[in-house]
Amino acid sequence: PVSKGPAVDAGQAVAAALAIQEQISTLNEALKKEGQPALRMRIGIHSGTVLTGSLGSSRRLEYAVIGDTVNCASRLEGLDKQRHQGMVRILISGDTQSLIETLPPHIAHESWGTVLIKGRLEPLEVIELRSTAP
């Protein structure tokens, strides 16, 4: 993947997460009709530099994305699972929020304050995004 710039990349990541959040109820209705359990998920988004590429030996190469940014996004996804309400929870970092010009009017955001993320010395500002659309 090639970056389109930090602001565009952050906006596209958040737009994708919001699209998932807004459409998962339709998917869950279809799953219910088939007798399948509903899906729930958590999404963490942090913006910054990552290292991408094929890693490993010539016998076994795997495409990977690594770095502090990836670690932070993963930690946001797994943060305080007891606070997960609804079908999809989206947590973004303050770094990501600062890159996004505007959110759609039907998107509420709630600050969780700053959180010390495992593996980092600096705490992250954490914001939850939630659709208020019916």
Which residues fall in each region the model found?
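Sterically constrained small-residue positions within well-ordered secondary structures
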Residues: 34-36, 54, 117-120
